[in-house]
Amino acid sequence: MGQYTASQRKNVRILLVGDAGVGKTSLILSLVSEEYPEEVPPRAEEITIPANVTPEQVPTSIVDFSAVEQSEDALAAEINKAHVVCIVYAVDDDDTLDRITSHWLPLVRAKCNPSLDGEGDAEAEAEGDTQREPIRKPIVLVGNKIDLIEYSTMDSVLAIMEDYPEIESCVECSAKSLHNISEMFYYAQKAVLHPTSPLYMMEEQELTSACKKSLVRIFKICDIDGDNLLNDYELNLFQRRCFNTPLQPQILDEVKAVIQKNVPDGIYNDAVTLKGFLFLHCLFIQRGRNETTWAVLRRFGYNDQLEMCQEYLRPPLKIPPGSSTELSHRGQQFLIAVFERYDRDGDGALSPEEHKMLFSTCPAAPWSYSTDIRKSCPINETTGWVTLHGWLCRWTLMTLIDVVKTMEYLAYLGFNVHENDSQLAAIHVTRERRIDLAKRQSSRSVYKCHVIGPKGSGKTGMCRGFLVEDMHKLIGKEFKTNVVNCINSVQVYGQEKHLILRDIDVRHALDPLQPQEVNCDVACLVYDSSNPRSFEYVARIYIKYYAESKIPVMIVGTKCDMDERRQDYLMQPSEFCDKYKLLPPHLFSLKTNKKELYTKLATMAAFPHLRQFGLMTEDPKLWLKAGLGVAAATMLGFIVLKTISAAGAHTR
C-alpha cells in the first residue's frame, strides 16, 4: 500500500489586486513572456501555469483585477475564489503603500467575512454566530518598480505584517528588469501550500498552540523507547519516514549543536528533548522553511487547519455482507509494542497512569479505564490493572464492533508512521458467513455470543465469570456497572479463539428483540433453574427468533447449585431441547468454577453447520457425514462429538 501522507491542495489560484498603475498586469505578462511588455492592456487574461514548470509541482492560475473593467461585486467573487491575494504597491509611490492598510487589507478581510460588514454583522449576531473565527485569506505584499529607487520599503512593510497575521510574506520586485518576478509567484504559491499563520505567531515569535500540540504528539510517537528523548536511531527513523532519506551524521551533529547553542536543555545525553524538537521547527519557520514543518505534519496526517485528515483516520474499507473484521498479525504486533512501550515498570500491566499516558497522542481514550476495559476484559486480579492479554482483548472487541474507531485510534497512536502503511494493514476482513456454512467450518478467530434471558436469571454473573480465574469471587456480588460486552480467549481444538459475550438487557418479557440483538454467531438462552417461571421466557425467545434461523443455540440453566424446580411451561427444558433438536440444557453455577460452557459456545460458533447438535449427539456417524474437511482426516470429528456430548452432563 505504501506510506500515506495527508495530501496538500491540488491547485493554487492567485489574485493580484492594487491601485491603478502599480504594475499588476505588467508583473503577470513579464512572468509569462520573460520580458517587459511595451504595451500593457488594462487587464491580463487569466493564465494557468502547468504543474511541471512550478517549483511545488502544482498547477497555478494567476488572475488580474482591474477596477476600470470590473465591478466591486466581481472583485468580491474573485477574492473568495482565490487561495491567496497579492496586494501590489509601487515602491516609488508612498500613497499606494499607505492604501494597503487604509483600503486593501480591510477590503479583503470584509469580502472574506461578510459578517464584519454592517448588515451581515447584525445577521450573525441574530443567529448567535458571533463567536465564529474570521476567515484569514493568505496575503503576499508585493512592492513593484524596485528598479526606480535605490532604497527599500521593507521596514514599512514589516511593520504592517505585525498587525496583520494573514500576511504570509513580502517581496520587492521589478516587472521591467524581471527582478524577483518568479520569486514573487513562488511566495504566493508557498503562502497557500505551506502557510505560516497556522504554525507561527509573528507578534509573539513562537509556535501556535495548535502547531505545538501537533508536534508534541509527533515527538511522542517517534519516541520509540519512551524515554522522552529522540536518540540518533529515532531521529534517523523520523527523517526516513518524513523525507525518505537518511540523516547524515555530520548534519545530525550540526543540528544538535544549533539546538544546544539556543536551548540549554534542548539536548540531554546526546539526544534531542521535546524543547529542542519544538525549537528546531520554530527555527525552520523563522528561516522561511515552512515546507519542512508542513512535510512532517502532513506525513503524520494533518491538514492545512492542523486537524487530522478524515482520509488519514478512516481509509475506505470494504466489508462484504456476512463478513467481520479482526486484527491482523501486524495490527496485534503494533499494539503489543505500544503496550510494552508504556508499561514503564515492566510488570506486564498498565496502571491507570500508564494507560492515560499511552493515549496522550489521542483526543481522548477510546474507553474508560475504570468502567470499561477493567470490567469487560481479563485483568491482573491482584492489582486490578489491565494486562497485555486484556489489552489485546479490548482492541479485538472494538475491531469487531466498530472497526472505523479502531482505525482512527491506530492512526492516533502512529501505526501509519511506524508500519509505513495505512491502518488497513492492521485489519483482517474475514470471508463471508455463507462461505463458512458451505465449507462447514469458520475461518474466523473472533465470535459473538448473545446472552439472552429474563432479569435475575444470572446471565450477568455468567458473563463476568468468563473474565476471572476464580468465579467464587463473584458469588453474591452486586454488579453496579452495566457492561454490555465481556471478551476473553478460549482454546478450540488447539487454536486460540476470542469469544465476546454480549449481555442483552431485556426489561420486560414481552419486549421485542431488535435484529441487532438477535443476530450473532451463537446464542446463549439463559434461565434460572431454581425459578419455576424462568424457562418460559427462554422458550418463547427461541420459538420466535431462533427456531427457523441458522444460528446455533445453547440453553443454559443457571444457579444449578440450588434446588432445581419444575418449570411452569408446556414442556420441561430437556423435553423442549429434544423437540427442537438442541443440546440438553447446560447447567451452570458460579460455585462450581467450571468453564467448559465458554469453550462449548466458541465451538458451536466455529462450526456453524452443526446447528442441530441434538441430532448429532445421537449417532457418531452423523459427525463424519457433516463433513468437517480436515477434521475428518485428523479425527477432529470424534473430538467435537466428545466435547459437545459432554454438554448434556450437569455441571455442579
UniProtKB/Swiss-Prot annotation:
Q: What is its EC number?
A: 3.6.5.-
Residues engaged in binding Ca(2+) 1:
D223, D225, D227, E234
Residues annotated for GTP 1 binding in this entry:
18-25, 64-68, 144-147
Into which EC class is this enzyme placed? hydrolase
Q: Which residues cross the membrane?
A: 622-641
InterPro entries membership? EF-hand-dom_pair, EF_Hand_1_Ca_BS, EF_hand_assoc_1, EF_hand_assoc_2, EF_hand_dom, Miro, Miro-EF-hand_domain, MIRO_dom
Mitochondrial intermembrane face: residue ranges?
A: 642-652
What would be an example GO MF term here? GTPase activity
Write out the residues that bind GTP 2: 453-460, 491-495, 558-561
Q: Where in or outside the cell is it found?
A: Mitochondrion outer membrane
Q: What is its main location?
A: mitochondrion
Positions annotated to bind Ca(2+) 2? D343, D345, D347, E354
User: What happens when the protein's gene is inactivated?
Assistant: Flies die at early pupal stage and exhibit abnormal locomotion. Mitochondria in muscles and neurons are abnormally distributed. Instead of being transported into axons and dendrites, mitochondria accumulate in parallel rows in neuronal somata. Mutant NMJs lack presynaptic mitochondria, but neurotransmitter release and acute Ca(2+) buffering is only impaired during prolonged stimulation. RNAi-mediated knockdown perturbs mitochondrial distribution and dynamics.
Which ranges carry the EF-hand domain?
Answer: 210-245, 330-365
Checking Gene3D superfamilies in the record gives: EF-hand (1.10.238.10), P-loop containing nucleotide triphosphate hydrolases (3.40.50.300)
**Origin: domain of life:** Eukaryota
Pfam families, per database record: EF_assoc_1, EF_assoc_2, Ras
Family from the record: Belongs to the mitochondrial Rho GTPase family.
Q: How does it assemble?
A: Interacts with kinesin-associated protein milt. Interacts with vimar.
Please give the name of this protein: Mitochondrial Rho GTPase
- What species is given as this protein's source? Drosophila melanogaster
Name of the gene this protein is made from: Miro
